[in-house]
Structure formats: structure tokens, C-alpha cells
């Protein structure tokens, strides 16, 4: 009985235990369901609240604010970029130019102090105003695309005349020579007291100066030192060059006419002089018997020389001694240059015969008139290590007055059109140690010179002539690869007479609008031109030193004509 009761009690307890666990399980399941529903509801509410129309409308506002932040950030970065560009493209070059100016001033001042200590000279250092540093002897216009003749000269500008004029009716100032370096310029001309045709006695005026800018921004040439070489020496055909030691000048010493000189059998006396920064002038006779042993007449080219690689280079021309080694080396050599789009009517063999004869004009007794270049080492000693280069006549025409120029890294020889070829010629020139090599020239068809028939301005065929006039071109417009595109110069715009001086910019075919000195009947002669830039304003200027007729005081007055180079964008 008791065992039966115990079994019943045990079964009841087991049943109650099972019911308890079921209840716990059910409660747990219900709690999980409730929690799941709650989480789902919360998620649903959240998702519905996140995509309300109000929030959707605020998206564009948020994006706009983000755009503003990005734009502000970019603007800030652009300011940095602009500052970097200004520093690199504008301020750094100017700083370099100023540094160059400071260094040049310091070096020049030091050299002056040393020089002054040696000669008791207390002179100051000559150097152009900082406005010109980096604007002298450089490629002034570098342009591959613009028409060269879209550049043109302004009207002539009033500026300080740094060239003395004759003071009597019989006075004569002629044959200007000019050269300008990065620190100073040098100028010289011949002074004759009794008319321009007197060959027996003359003075030589020589000046050293710098470029200045006035308080109103005007360009002017300031003469710092000048001297009039009035002695028993009759210097002629002088060429001047600005060198680190002052103004180097090469002259011939003559007492006879040019025709008589060519008839002689001895070379012409030559002298190398130097006008120092302290105003002292010294010179030394050249060893003509060695240097010019193959010549009967020899002259500097009148145009300026150039300082290249510690040497000064001067143009030379004159007559070779018949059957001398130099004369024999040129025998049979010739070159024919042709006008643009203007062929020769003569037969080829006749052209060649006339071209060969052009080197031996009858005026000088059939002597071969030859071009040459003389280089002299620039040191405290004058006339040191002179070397004469005689280029082949397969490159050069008959010898004539000329000029050696350096612009940028390029060197050129201008040769006056004394022979049959009227357009201006610039021979590219390379130098190696003491010698020079000339290459086929740039020609400027519209930059002509007047001449006597059959070698007048429009002439096109080879002929034997001694004619023309010295009117050098200055390299002005370059390609980016440094080849020459155009030049500036002042030409005499007449067929035969030395009349009508006009300034213009020239390419190989044509010319720009011109600036005239006066009427077409204005008498003129030699012109020599040099261009430079005022770096601060980026304005390019050109100076043409021209011999202009002067009816009251002397036959000619040498006038420095100054123009600004402008651009016509319509061309």
C-alpha cells in the first residue's frame, strides 16, 4: 500500500516538473518573439523616419554645403598654386636678374678698386641701370608664329643726344662705330676739320657710357668718359668693342687715299687701342709685317666688334697681294647669292665669270678684295695673340666693311653690300679658340642699299662693283630654336642715291611699316643699329646711329635715332 502511494506521488512530481519546464520554455519563446517584434518595429520606425520627405529635401542642402566646403578648399589650394606660379614665373626671374646685377656691380667695383689702386684712379664702376640687366645682347623677341613684319618701329623718340656734332661749316663727323655689352657701351667716330673728303689728318672721338632710365621712365644714354684723340696719328676706319677692360678700338693709320693704298706693296699700319674705365687711352701698333704679310691694304670694318670667349673679334677687309699664299688659296673661288623670287636672265657660265670678276674690281687695280676677321686676346697687354681668319670666297662676297655681333649665344658677321648683291647679309659665325668660321648667310630681300648701275638696289646679276653704303641690320626676332627670323635696321630707301633713310623690321622677304627720318630727298649715309630691352617694362627699343645731312654745320651730323618696337596684332 505504501509502495503504491509512493509511486503515485513520484509520478505526480514528475508530471509537475515537466509542466514547469514547458511553462519556462513557452515564456522564453514568447519573450524572444516579443523582442524580435520590438526590434523589427524599431527598425521599421527608424527606416521610415530616415526617408521622410523632410530628410530627402535636406539632401540637396547637405550636398550644397559639401560643395561649398570643397570649393573653399580648392580656392585655398588655388591661392597656393597662384603664389607658387608668381614665385616661379615672375619673382624668381626678377630676383635672379637683381642677383646678376648685384654680382656684376660687385665684380666691376672690385676690378675698379684694383685698377684704381694701381693707377690712383678713384672712378666708380660703370654699369647700366638695373632696368636693363638681362635685356642687352639677348634674343629680344622669341616668336615662332607671328608675322615678323607685324613688329614695327614707333616714331623717333626724343632722348639725350650723346654724340657731339660739328661746330663749323667745314667740320665733318663721320664713320660711327658702336658696341654695347651687359655693363657699358662704347662709341667712336672720326672728326675731320676741313671737309669730309680730307684723308690727311683727322681726330678720333671715343666715348664710354651706360644706359640710364630717367625719373619719368625715359631711356637715355649717359656718357661717363670721353676723349678726343687729337694728335699726329691719322686714325681711319675704326671699329670699337665693349670689353671687360673698357673700350677696345682697332684703327688703320693712313696718309694716302684708299686707291693709293691698294697700289702699294706694303700692308696698312694698324693700331689696337684701349680706352680704360679711368679715362686713360693707350694703344699699340700691330705687327703688320707678320699678321698682314699677304695684304697690300687692310682696314677694320668700321662696324663694332664683339667680345667672345676672352677675345675681341673685329671685322677686316682689304686687298690681297697678288700671288701671295692667301691670294692663291682664293683663286677660282666664288659664290653667287640670288634675290628672292628673281632669277638671273644670264647664262650660267657668264654668271660664274662675272661672279669671279667681282672679287677683283678695276678701281683697286685688280687686287682681290678680301673679307677677314681678326681676334685679339683681351688682357692688360694690348695686341696680344692676334689671329687673322680669312674665310673662303665660297661663302663670302667681295670684301667690304662689316660688323661682328653677338646676340644671345649666336654670333654674326654683317658684310656691307659693296659688291653686286644689294640685300643685307648676316653670316652666322662660329668661333673655336682663336679662329672663326662663317656659314651661308641670312639675306633680307627688302633691306637694300642704293648703288651705282649695274649694282643698284634692284640689281640681281653678278657684276664687278665698288658701291653701296654701310647700313647694318640687328638681329631682333628669333625662333624658339634660336634661328634668326627678322632684323631691325635703318636703310636708305633709294635705287641709286644715298637718300631717304627709313627704319623698319625686316624678314627674309619683306619689311614692316617704316618710320621716316624726313622726306624722300633727305641725304644720309652710314647707319648702325643696336636693340635692347627695358626688362621691368618688357619694352624693346632700337637705336640707329645715322649720318644725316646737315646743311649749316658740316656735311653730316651723326644722329642717334631711338624707336620702341611695337606690334600690330592685325597683321
From Swiss-Prot:
Main location: virion
Bilayer-spanning residue ranges: 27-47
A Pfam match: HN
Disulfide bridge map: 172-196, 186-247, 238-251, 455-465, 531-542
GO biological process entries: symbiont entry into host cell; virion attachment to host cell
Enzyme class: hydrolase
A cellular component annotation (GO) from this entry: host cell plasma membrane
Regions of this protein lying in the Intravirion compartment: 1-26
Topology with respect to the bilayer: Single-pass type II membrane protein
Subcellular location: Virion membrane; Host cell membrane
Catalytic function, reaction form: Hydrolysis of alpha-(2->3)-, alpha-(2->6)-, alpha-(2->8)- glycosidic linkages of terminal sialic acid residues in oligosaccharides, glycoproteins, glycolipids, colominic acid and synthetic substrates
Stretches for region Involved in neuraminidase activity: 234-239
GO molecular function: exo-alpha-sialidase activity; host cell surface receptor binding
Functional note: Mediates the viral entry into the host cell together with fusion/F protein. Attaches the virus to sialic acid-containing cell receptors and thereby initiates infection. Binding of HN protein to the receptor induces a conformational change that allows the F protein to trigger virion/cell membranes fusion.
Domain notes: The C-terminus (head domain) is involved in binding the cellular receptor.
Protein name as annotated: Hemagglutinin-neuraminidase
Organism annotation: Newcastle disease virus (strain Iba/85)
